[in-house]
């Protein structure tokens, strides 16, 4: 079953944080489970940077499954026999929701370089419009990992009486200088690709080389040195090119870079990376404590101690800020060979924390 589609903001455009406006916004979304009679079991799932609206896919239709396939189903951490789950593709994405590759109704051409700047705050306001469209009066919980964790946090700030619980997996309240630096290098790889053309490449060749390189760097931040050592060590390829895929780890990264080209748009990657960099709960408030003090939801924060992207020190800072703001908080930390991506694949470790956070 493919994602469902709805067009929102058809009468009045959505005013964005940085001053842009978007109307006629297409939103791709999917639902799982059954909404109960009093509509009290709805849970919004917020996807990570390159995710989509379908965390679960029917094995009959797609053998690879969705990005949270092993976590979702009857009796699992994301229990479809108890909760009604909603997940939508984010604003600025390229998986069915309006983004830079979408057709601008004013020009009948892809937005490209004309697509406005988007923030996590804008993404959340579009999600709220979707929830209203679905006639859901209240959310039992909002859950997300990484970029999705930032969205979950913003939900609790913007709509404190609408959300009962927040589950934030592997995400701090703001991005670190080091992480912004990684994103800068990824952006430069794309922007300096000869095919980028200031983002207006849809009638020609896309900046595939730059996007592939960006993805390779990103993959290194999602993994751990121990994981790479176990998988590849210093093993070489039998016929590896001296300046290219000489080591097996290089071949793996090249494969991941090429694989990414078939499923993501370079402009969307640029916009969402910058939204990740810029996110700050204090936007629109005098300071971060004022923003966090609005949260009434019970907040579950989960950290992976050897996460290479959202470092433990930043999660500790986030924990302290939440506590100082009086947010009711459960905090967990533990190591995982999977590093930042643990929230997507390390079911045994994350299952009890997710289940507890949703209770």
Curated annotation (Swiss-Prot):
Pathway involvement of the protein, from the record: Amino-acid biosynthesis; L-methionine biosynthesis via de novo pathway; O-acetyl-L-homoserine from L-homoserine: step 1/1
Subcellular location: Cytoplasm
Any Pfam family: Abhydrolase_1
Keyword annotations of the record: Acyltransferase, Amino-acid biosynthesis, Cytoplasm, Methionine biosynthesis, Transferase
Record domain AB hydrolase-1: where: 41-346
One Gene Ontology term, aspect cellular component: cytoplasm
Gene3D superfamilies: 1.10.1740.110, alpha/beta hydrolase (3.40.50.1820)
GO MF assignments: homoserine O-acetyltransferase activity
SUPFAM superfamilies per UniProt: alpha/beta-Hydrolases
Top-level class of the enzyme under EC nomenclature: transferase
Residues annotated for substrate binding in this entry: 215, 341
InterPro entries, per database record: AB_hydrolase_1 (IPR000073), AB_hydrolase_fold (IPR029058), HAT_MetX-like (IPR008220)
GO BP annotations, alphabetical order: homoserine metabolic process; methionine biosynthetic process
Active site location: 146 (nucleophile), 307, 340
EC number: 2.3.1.31
Role this protein plays: Transfers an acetyl group from acetyl-CoA to L-homoserine, forming acetyl-L-homoserine.
The family this protein is said to belong to: Belongs to the AB hydrolase superfamily. MetX family.
Name of the featured protein: Homoserine O-acetyltransferase
Annotated organism of origin: Mannheimia succiniciproducens (strain KCTC 0769BP / MBEL55E)
Lineage of the species this protein comes from: Bacteria, Pseudomonadati, Pseudomonadota, Gammaproteobacteria, Pasteurellales
């Amino acid at each position: 079953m493919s994602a469902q589609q709805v067009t929102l903001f058809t009468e009045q455009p959505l005013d964005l944080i940085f001053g842009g406006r978007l109307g006629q916004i297409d939103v791709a979304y999917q639902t799982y489970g059954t909404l109960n009679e009093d509509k009290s079991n709805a849970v919004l799932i917020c996807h990570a940077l390159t995710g989509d609206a379908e965390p679960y896919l029917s094995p009959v239709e797609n053998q690879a499954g969705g990005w949270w396939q092993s976590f979702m189903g009857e009796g699992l951490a994301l229990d479809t026999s108890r909760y009604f789950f909603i997940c939508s593709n984010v604003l600025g994405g390229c998986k069915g929701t309006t983004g830079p590759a979408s057709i601008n109704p004013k020009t009948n051409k892809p937005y490209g370089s004309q697509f406005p700047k988007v923030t996590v705050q804008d993404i959340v306001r579009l999600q709220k419009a979707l929830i209203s469209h679905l006639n859901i009066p209240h959310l039992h919980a909002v859950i997300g990992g990484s970029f999705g964790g930032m969205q979950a946090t913003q939900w609790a700030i913007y709509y404190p009486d609408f959300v009962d619980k927040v589950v934030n997996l592997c995400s701090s309240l703001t991005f670190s200088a080091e992480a912004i630096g990684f994103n800068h290098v990824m952006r430069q790889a794309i922007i300096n690709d000869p095919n980028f053309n200031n983002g207006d490449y849809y009638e020609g060749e896309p900046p595939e080389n730059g996007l592939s390189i960006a993805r390779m760097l990103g993959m290194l931040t999602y993994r751990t040195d121990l994981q790479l050592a176990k998988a590849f060590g210093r093993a070489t390829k039998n016929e590896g090119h001296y300046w290219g895929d000489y080591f097996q780890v290089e071949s793996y990264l090249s494969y991941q870079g090429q694989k990414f080209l078939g499923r993501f748009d370079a402009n969307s990657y640029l916009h969402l990376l910058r939204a990740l960099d810029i996110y700050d709960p204090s936007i629109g408030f005098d300071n971060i404590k004022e923003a966090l003090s609005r949260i009434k939801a019970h907040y579950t924060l989960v950290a992976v101690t050897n996460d290479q992207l959202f470092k433990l020190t930043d999660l500790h800072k986030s924990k302290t800020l939440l506590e100082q703001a009086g947010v009711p908080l459960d905090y967990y930390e533990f190591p995982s060979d999977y590093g930042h991506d643990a929230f997507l694949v390390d079911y045994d470790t994350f299952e009890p924390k997710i289940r507890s956070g949703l209770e």
